[in-house]
């Protein structure tokens, strides 16, 4: 970790992006991040994860696959997003974030109105956002916040569009645990 992370860490200060760039927020063990990087070698993927065990796991996946199109932010994604340029991202993923299911903890949820506004700032018009959760209340909560303000449009046309994993989805260890109170739900949005 001490040798690979410094070369992949997103530097402090304003982030300069070139070419197509995707962001995975809270990449957990890094399985999805590494798989997307492998499937899309012409895309730069940035992963943000505050927990050291997740970062170490992602580094292992990146090293084993010899990936050269990944950058990592080992901290709170909000610190990174405020440094990203307007419209710099073409895609973002928020997959199975901590649901904070108790009402008194809802203020700790990642998906809040201010955060959605910051995401809208950094995702270019026409760019996409995927949110997935296995907690019904968090799905409802997030859907309402992503649709508020008209910055994102939900792309679903039929029930199957959110009840099954998208074709390009990579299942993670966390997702396999099925810790939530419902089957996984996948919400795809486009930046208006």
Language-model features: locations:
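A short glycine-rich, Lys/Arg-flanked "PGG" loop and its adjoining helix->strand segment in the class I
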Residues: 111-125
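Conserved beta-strand signature within the Rossmann-like core of class I S-adenosyl-L-methionine
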Residues: 126-133
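Conserved glycine-rich SAM-binding loop
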Residues: 28
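S-adenosyl-L-methionine
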Residues: 1-23, 31-40, 59-86
């Amino acid at each position: 970790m001490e040798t690979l992370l410094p070369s992949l860490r997103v530097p402090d200060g304003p982030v300069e992006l070139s070419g197509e760039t995707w962001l995975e927020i809270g990449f957990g063990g890094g399985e999805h991040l590494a798989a997307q990087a492998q499937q899309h070698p012409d895309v730069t993927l940035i992963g943000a994860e505050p927990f050291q065990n997740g970062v170490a796991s992602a580094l292992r996946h990146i090293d084993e696959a010899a990936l050269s199109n990944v950058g990592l932010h080992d901290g709170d994604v909000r610190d990174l997003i405020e440094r990203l340029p307007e419209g710099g991202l073409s895609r973002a993923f928020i997959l199975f974030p901590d649901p904070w299911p108790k009402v008194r903890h809802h203020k700790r949820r990642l998906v809040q109105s201010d955060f959605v506004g910051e995401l809208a700032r950094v995702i270019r018009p026409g760019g996409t956002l995927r949110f997935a959760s296995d907690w019904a209340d968090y799905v409802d909560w997030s859907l309402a916040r992503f649709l508020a303000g008209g910055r994102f449009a939900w792309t679903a046309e039929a029930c199957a569009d959110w009840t099954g994993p998208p074709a390009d989805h990579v299942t993670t260890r966390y997702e396999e645990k099925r810790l939530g109170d419902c089957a996984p739900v996948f919400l795809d949005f486009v930046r208006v």
